[in-house]
């Protein structure tokens, strides 16, 4: 279905898909409009591993998996859910935060003068005590299922209680 450029209404002359296309295996794809691709055809050479087929197989596997499981829709849904819950939990615990990012790469910041970095570090430390390695940014993936998100948000709830009490003192 394309990349994020379609979602946000851009029509780029060229798009390059890299490492994620093969889920870490060596493959990339270059697509573009006819004018750009015609020029690129005369100048573009990439042959470092062009006889190696694992990257191609991985790329096809990733594309098929994404199509079959509607990964982009899943990731956006999870990202929106977490963004909304961050805001609800912050309001519940009287914390001032702002939430930013695309639905698939989300983050929050505390809105306390000169304390954001400290509070993010505190958030990370307290989440570790909940057995979750987390900071204020999440790169959503298909692995983020309901049970994982629920556990994460329950831990955020507990951690926000502690941060709220810290700010009050």
Regions found by a protein language model. Give the residues of each.
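Conserved N-terminal phosphate-binding loop of PLP-dependent enzymes in the Aspartate aminotransferase
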Residues: 1-169
């Amino acid at each position: 279905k394309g990349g994020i450029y379609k979602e946000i209404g851009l029509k780029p002359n060229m798009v390059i898909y890299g490492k994620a296309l093969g889920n870490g295996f060596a493959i990339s794809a270059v697509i573009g409009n006819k004018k750009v691709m015609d020029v690129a055809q005369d100048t573009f050479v990439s042959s470092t591993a062009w006889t190696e087929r694992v990257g191609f197989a991985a790329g096809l596997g990733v594309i098929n998996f994404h199509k079959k499981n509607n990964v982009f829709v899943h990731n956006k849904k999870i990202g929106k859910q977490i963004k909304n819950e961050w805001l609800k939990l912050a309001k519940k615990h009287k914390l001032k935060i702002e939430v930013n990012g695309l639905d698939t790469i989300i983050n929050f910041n505390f809105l306390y003068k000169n304390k954001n970095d400290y509070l993010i570090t505190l958030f990370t430390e307290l989440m570790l005590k909940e057995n979750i390695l987390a900071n204020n940014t999440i790169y959503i993936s298909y692995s983020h299922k309901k049970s994982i998100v629920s556990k994460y948000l329950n831990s955020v709830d507990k951690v926000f209680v502690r941060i709220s009490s810290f700010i009050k003192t």
